């Protein structure tokens, strides 16, 4: 696994995590 794919994987994890936090925050949980 090279550094580019690792960086993309990390970026997707952070993006998905922050997006789910926003959704949960708006739904009142």
UniProtKB/Swiss-Prot annotation:
Gene Ontology molecular-function annotations: electron transporter, transferring electrons within cytochrome b6/f complex of photosystem II activity
Q: What is its main location?
A: plastid
What HAMAP family does the annotation carry? Answer: Cytb6_f_PetN
Q: How does it assemble?
A: The 4 large subunits of the cytochrome b6-f complex are cytochrome b6, subunit IV (17 kDa polypeptide, PetD), cytochrome f and the Rieske protein, while the 4 small subunits are PetG, PetL, PetM and PetN. The complex functions as a dimer.
Please give the name of this protein.
Cytochrome b6-f complex subunit 8
Compartments it resides in: Plastid, Chloroplast thylakoid membrane
The UniProt keyword set, sorted, is: Chloroplast, Electron transport, Membrane, Photosynthesis, Plastid, Thylakoid, Transmembrane, Transmembrane helix, Transport
Task: Please spell out the taxonomic lineage of the organism that makes this protein.
Answer: Eukaryota, Viridiplantae, Streptophyta, Embryophyta, Tracheophyta
Family membership, please give it. Answer: Belongs to the PetN family.
| Recorded topology in the membrane | Single-pass membrane protein
Name the gene.
Answer: petN
- GO CC aspect terms: chloroplast thylakoid membrane; cytochrome b6f complex
Q: Which Pfam families match?
A: PetN
Q: Which GO biological process categories is it annotated with? A: cytochrome complex assembly; photosynthesis
């Amino acid at each position: 696994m090279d550094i580019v794919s690792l960086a993309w994987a990390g970026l997707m994890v952070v993006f998905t995590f922050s997006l789910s936090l926003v959704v949960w925050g708006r739904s009142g949980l």
